Amino acid sequence: KTLKRVFRKNSHDPEFLYFLKHQDPFQPHRLPKAWISAMAKWITQIENHSGSPFPINVIQGDVDGTLDWQYNIELLDKKFANMTLAMIRGAGHHMVNEREDLREKIFAAIKL
């Protein structure tokens, strides 16, 4: 059992979006219901996780329409006391496949 996948505009790079939808052999056009069940299970696991004192660096685009990033940021902030957040104005979900000006900001936010 599968569901039809909807490809959203989640990057500002039109060539990448075309590739993703029409040429990438690793992008399914139908999603197994088991994948959706696995995602729901993962959400429950992260919500029930006790958290961690380890520092994490979250890089998030403010036009990401693929996931509920506002909810995720709030949840991660509660779970990880040492979280730093870099919000990238105008960036979507596929951050490394964004326009060059956005990628520069994204890569500058990476802290090793």
Q: Where would I find each of the regions flagged by the language model?
A:
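Catalytic active-site module of serine/aspartate enzymes centered on a nucleophile-bearing elbow/loop
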Residues: 82-112
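Acidic catalytic loop of the alpha/beta-hydrolase fold
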Residues: 27-28, 63-67
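Active-site nucleophile elbow and catalytic-triad environment of alpha/beta-hydrolase enzymes
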Residues: 30-49, 54
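Alpha/beta-hydrolase-fold enzymes
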Residues: 1-31
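Short beta-strand/loop motif that positions the catalytic acidic residue
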Residues: 52, 58-64
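Alpha-helical elements of Rossmann-like donor-binding domains used by nucleotide-donor carbohydrate transfer enzymes
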Residues: 38, 71-74, 105, 109
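Short alpha-helix in the alpha/beta-hydrolase fold that links the catalytic acid
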Residues: 54, 67-77
